[in-house]
């Protein structure tokens, strides 16, 4: 049988919308089973809606996810990361609502992307009810980190690098972040693959064979293209990890942070002029500095959390109050920086994507 995208040509708007929303509807019961709490009215507040007192987000479904995450006892750093992701999701959804009112998302493409992004968040933090969605909980290096990689190839490379004597402690910390970034890319690839598979099954279930010739699956074709790009990035990432693990870091490294390295590699193959590429390089330097600052606050937050637990075990009210105040300040600063990093990453990624699309 021919591939789905070769067998379809046009899609009625209503059927397309149902299909695009299908992956979110298929999220396992722990998330989807909240009944009326996830009704359209409560998920899509009025434009002027403001946060209720004591709530983290303006959208009720995001507040529910936040409360669920806190019950899962995620680490402070993971919670701060989730908070930043949900803030980005909220911003994008509220912006989309404005576009929808103006009739600028008639085909539902932007709505489908929002659904996909939320699915990624659910999977990334283990909020989708699945047992296989655990990810590494810390950017910090510790004695048992190799057990968190979950891939024999990565564990072997990490062990080789750690025992080679070619890396300083700072370089090992840097290399560990590269391993984490690589693992996260694999995880998100699997999430996208799963979402795409369920969407393709939706075509089969929603439409009769006679309808199939009239459906154009542009959305699925776009996701297939995204899968190929991600797989290419994964393969390049593994090649880099192998090279660095065996040879160590060279003296002429352009950038150090994995996300910045990925962006720079993509930018060099995009349709940028020489002047635009140089401008992008300078912006990446600023972005890397922002990431390093965020990493610093993440480490301080972890240290503060451990210290607070120690003080609480002793039971000194004055020390508890002082340490809790410091912890809360660090937590808020880490959330704020995390949001800025993710927003900046989103903006830079969009610019590279547009440049690569223009080239095609």
Curated annotation (Swiss-Prot):
UniProt GO MF annotations: heparin binding; lipase binding; low-density lipoprotein particle receptor binding; receptor antagonist activity; receptor ligand activity; very-low-density lipoprotein particle receptor binding
According to the UniProt entry, where does the motif Prevents secretion from ER sit in this chain? 357-360
Q: Gene3D superfamilies of this UniProt entry?
A: RAP domain (1.20.81.10)
Name its cellular compartments.
Rough endoplasmic reticulum lumen; Endoplasmic reticulum-Golgi intermediate compartment lumen; Golgi apparatus, cis-Golgi network; Golgi apparatus lumen
Q: Which UniProt keywords apply?
A: Coiled coil, Endoplasmic reticulum, Endosome, Glycoprotein, Golgi apparatus, Heparin-binding, Phosphoprotein, Signal
Give any Gene Ontology cellular component: endosome
Q: Using the record for this protein, list the coiled-coil segments as residue ranges, or answer none.
A: 222-302
Carbohydrate attachment sites?
Answer: 271
Phosphoserine sites (modified residues): 53, 138
TM spans, by residue? Answer: none
The record's InterPro entries line, in alphabetical order, gives: A2-macroglobuin_RAP, Alpha_2_MRAP_C, MG_RAP_rcpt_1, RAP_D2, RAP_D3, RAP_sf
Q: Where is this region: LDL receptor binding?
A: 240-356
Q: How does it assemble?
A: Interacts with the LRP1/alpha-2-macroglobulin receptor heavy and light chains; the interaction is transient and coincides with a reduction of ligand binding by the receptor. Interacts with LRP2/glycoprotein 330. Interacts with LRP1B; binding is followed by internalization and degradation. Interacts with LDLR. Interacts with SORL1. Interacts with LRP1; this interaction is followed by rapid internalization.
Please explain the role this protein plays, according to its UniProt record.
Answer: Molecular chaperone for LDL receptor-related proteins that may regulate their ligand binding activity along the secretory pathway.
For this entry, the protein name equals Alpha-2-macroglobulin receptor-associated protein
Name the source organism.
Answer: Rattus norvegicus
The beginning of the lineage is:
Eukaryota, Metazoa, Chordata, Craniata, Vertebrata
């Amino acid at each position: 049988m021919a591939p789905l995208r070769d067998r379809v040509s046009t899609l009625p708007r209503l059927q397309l919308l149902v299909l695009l929303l299908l992956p979110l509807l298929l999220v396992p019961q722990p998330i989807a089973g909240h009944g009326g709490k996830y009704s359209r009215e409560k998920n899509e507040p009025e434009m002027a809606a403001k946060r209720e007192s004591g709530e983290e987000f303006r959208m009720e479904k995001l507040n529910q996810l936040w409360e669920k995450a806190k019950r899962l006892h995620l680490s402070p750093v993971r919670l701060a990361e989730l908070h930043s992701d949900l803030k980005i999701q909220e911003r994008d959804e509220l912006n989309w609502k404005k576009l929808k009112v103006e009739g600028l998302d008639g085909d539902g493409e932007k709505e489908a992307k929002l659904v996909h992004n939320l699915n990624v968040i659910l999977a990334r933090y283990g909020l989708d009810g699945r047992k296989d969605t655990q990810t590494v909980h810390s950017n910090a290096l510790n004695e048992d980190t190799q057990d968190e990689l979950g891939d024999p190839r990565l564990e072997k490379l990490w062990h080789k690098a750690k025992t080679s004597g070619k890396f300083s402690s700072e370089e090992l910390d840097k290399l560990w972040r590269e391993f984490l970034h690589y693992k996260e890319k694999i995880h998100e690839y699997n999430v996208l693959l799963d979402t795409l598979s369920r969407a393709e099954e939706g075509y089969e279930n929603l439409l009769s064979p006679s309808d199939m010739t009239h459906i154009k699956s542009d959305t699925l074709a776009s996701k297939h293209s995204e899968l190929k790009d991600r797989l290419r990035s994964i393969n390049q990432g593994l090649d880099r990890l192998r090279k660095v693990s065996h040879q160590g870091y060279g003296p002429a490294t352009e950038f150090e942070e994995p996300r910045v390295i990925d962006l720079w590699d993509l930018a060099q193959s995009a349709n940028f002029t020489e002047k635009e590429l140089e401008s992008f390089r300078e912006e990446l330097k600023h972005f890397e500095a922002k990431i390093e600052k965020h990493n610093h606050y993440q480490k301080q937050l972890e240290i503060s959390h451990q210290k607070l637990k120690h003080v609480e075990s002793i039971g000194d009210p004055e020390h508890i109050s002082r340490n809790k105040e410091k912890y809360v300040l660090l937590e808020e600063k880490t959330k704020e920086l995390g949001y800025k990093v993710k927003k900046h990453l989103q903006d830079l990624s969009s610019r590279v994507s547009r440049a690569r699309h223009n080239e095609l």
